[in-house]
């Protein structure tokens, strides 16, 4: 039975989702979780895009030990050399070079002839191979490329040294039958086919990204590309968790097994959702809140008698636990540390002390702590530690005529303290007005969302905000048991990002 490898592009293609703006620390958190998920290759970013992207890719490359780290690059020498500088420190570095091959792209975007495109492919892959042990070539807009020219371009790339050939459905145009036949055509028409691994990369514009990816596996693809939760620009990418579980459940049909640690799927999905602010729909396959819920009386009766009557996936398979209580206020440092190790978190002594202190404060107010609480706590403390500004004091009181007044005290990374007060028609507006006055911003609140981490009146709150000033839009989140504190943390998180970004572009 063939093993299917997964290339995750959440940190590159996924971050192109409107409103998603991850900082370096957040990208590293996702990369570490992708490593725990057993992802074979992670596309850490586009190193040549900006200095920020370069530094993020480099840090991930120098951190990840058990996965290949890859950077995207155009078929340009400067991009390829920049990618090399970013990932050369990785245990397993890879270059991902791409060039469009469809008539519409060659004519209107590239302004290149077919001969020019073939020459550029050969030169860029040859250069890449002189620097990297593994080179992946993508024929952008492959599904709208003339098949004979696509086969010619692929052959040139393999002869130049490409180890992996990606056949992307860049605009989500194809369907399963066409995509399957395209892979079969290349298998028959590319003389050097056996010298490379073929990969699929599907977008969801017509809602067929997962189905097309599975069709590609049937057609011979050994690598599937996509993102966690299917995030990405426009309608998104193929959701890797859906492809992986489909292959596992229907291995009798696909004769393939996913190379992924399936029990880490739920934790990975939750982390990506909270850091990006992109809510997972309740009815989403595999990771949605209703994925294992049964409302119909007939269905409930059947499941109670025999679970397989209506449930083809065991919740535990993807790490969907019953959220059992795991720790309490009497739990010590050793028990806490061991539980966090079990969940995949490793700390320095300073980090452990800070997170344990936050845990004890939560345990004093919350009767029982669940795994979801611990993950949220870790997420919130990591974001809090990486912020440019932190909240040291927050006070809200009623003034008159439904007006609230908020006093906020912030401390920056150098230890400088800033204090201001403001009013608003509600507590949250007053808090946000005070923070704006301190940071000197004139931004607009583009989005505000709140969700409960777990059930119960003492549950942790997770608040997501999006701020917009001119053409700049960023997101931030905050986690706390108190809604106002979580809201303030989220605003400071986003506002710090916005202030830094505005200063950078100036």
Curated annotation (Swiss-Prot):
Question: Which segments constitute the Pyruvate carboxyltransferase domain?
Answer: 4-266
Which source organism does the UniProt entry give? Bacillus cereus (strain ZK / E33L)
Matching InterPro entries: 2-IPM_HCS-like, 2-isopropylmalate_synth_dimer, AIPM/Hcit_synth_CS, Aldolase_TIM, LeuA/HCS_post-cat, LeuA_allosteric_dom_sf, LeuA_bact_synth, PYR_CT
GO BP annotations of the record are: L-leucine biosynthetic process
- PROSITE patterns, sorted: AIPM_HOMOCIT_SYNTH_1 (PS00815), AIPM_HOMOCIT_SYNTH_2 (PS00816), PYR_CT (PS50991)
Q: Would you say which domain of life the source belongs to? A: Bacteria
> Which reaction equations make up its catalytic activity?
3-methyl-2-oxobutanoate + acetyl-CoA + H2O = (2S)-2-isopropylmalate + CoA + H(+)
Keyword Nucleotide-binding annotated: no
Cofactor(s) named in the record: Mn(2+)
What are the entry keywords?
A: Amino-acid biosynthesis, Branched-chain amino acid biosynthesis, Cytoplasm, Leucine biosynthesis, Manganese, Metal-binding, Transferase
Q: What is this protein called?
A: 2-isopropylmalate synthase
């Amino acid at each position: 039975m063939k093993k299917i490898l997964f290339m995750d592009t959440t940190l590159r293609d996924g971050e192109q989702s409107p409103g998603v703006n991850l900082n370096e620390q957040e990208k590293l958190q996702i990369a570490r979780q992708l490593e725990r998920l057993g992802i074979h290759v992670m596309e850490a970013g586009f190193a040549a895009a900006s200095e920020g992207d370069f530094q993020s890719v480099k840090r991930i490359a120098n951190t990840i030990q058990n996965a290949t780290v890859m950077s995207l690059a155009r078929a340009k020498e400067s991009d390829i050399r920049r990618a090399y500088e970013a990932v050369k420190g990785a245990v397993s570095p890879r270059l991902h070079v791409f060039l469009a091959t469809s008539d519409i792209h060659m004519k209107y975007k590239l302004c290149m002839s077919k001969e020019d495109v073939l020459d550029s492919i050969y030169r860029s892959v040859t250069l890449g191979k002189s620097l990297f042990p593994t080179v992946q070539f993508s024929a952008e807009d492959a599904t709208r490329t003339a098949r004979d020219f696509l086969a010619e371009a692929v052959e040139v790339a393999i002869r130049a040294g490409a180890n992996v050939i990606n056949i992307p459905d860049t605009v989500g145009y194809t369907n399963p039958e066409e995509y399957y036949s395209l892979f079969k055509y290349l298998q028959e028409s590319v003389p050097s086919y056996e010298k490379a691994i073929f990969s699929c990369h599907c977008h969801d514009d017509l809602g067929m990204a997962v189905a097309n990816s599975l069709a590609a596996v049937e057609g011979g693809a050994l690598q599937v590309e996509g993102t966690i939760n299917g995030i990405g620009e426009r309608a998104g990418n193929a959701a890797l968790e859906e492809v992986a579980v489909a292959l596992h459940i229907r291995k009798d049909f696909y004769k393939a097994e996913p190379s992924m640690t399936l029990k880490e799927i739920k934790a990975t999905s939750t982390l990506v959702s909270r850091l990006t602010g992109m809510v997972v729909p309740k009815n989403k396959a595999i990771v949605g809140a209703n994925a294992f819920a049964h409302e119909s009386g007939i269905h409930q009766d059947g499941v109670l008698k025999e679970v397989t009557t209506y449930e083809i996936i065991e919740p535990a398979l993807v790490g969907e636990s019953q959220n059992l209580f795991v720790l309490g206020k009497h739990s010590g440092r050793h028990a806490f540390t061991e539980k966090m190790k079990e969940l995949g978190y490793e700390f320095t002594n300073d980090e452990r002390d800070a997170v344990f202190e936050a845990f004890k404060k939560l345990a004093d107010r919350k009767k029982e702590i669940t795994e979801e609480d611990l993950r949220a706590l870790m997420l919130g403390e990591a974001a809090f530690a990486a912020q440019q500004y932190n909240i040291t004091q927050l006070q809200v009181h009623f003034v008159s005529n439904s007006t609230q007044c908020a006093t906020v005290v912030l401390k920056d990374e150098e230890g400088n303290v800033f204090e201001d007060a403001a009013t608003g028609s509600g507590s949250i507006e007053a808090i946000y007005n005070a923070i704006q006055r301190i940071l000197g911003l004139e931004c607009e609140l583009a989005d505000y969302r709140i969700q409960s981490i777990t059930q119960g009146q003492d549950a942790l709150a997770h608040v997501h905000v999006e701020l917009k000033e001119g053409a700049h839009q960023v997101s931030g989140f905050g986690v706390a048991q108190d809604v106002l504190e979580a809201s303030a943390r989220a605003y400071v998180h986003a506002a710090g990002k916005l202030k830094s970004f505005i200063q950078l572009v100036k």
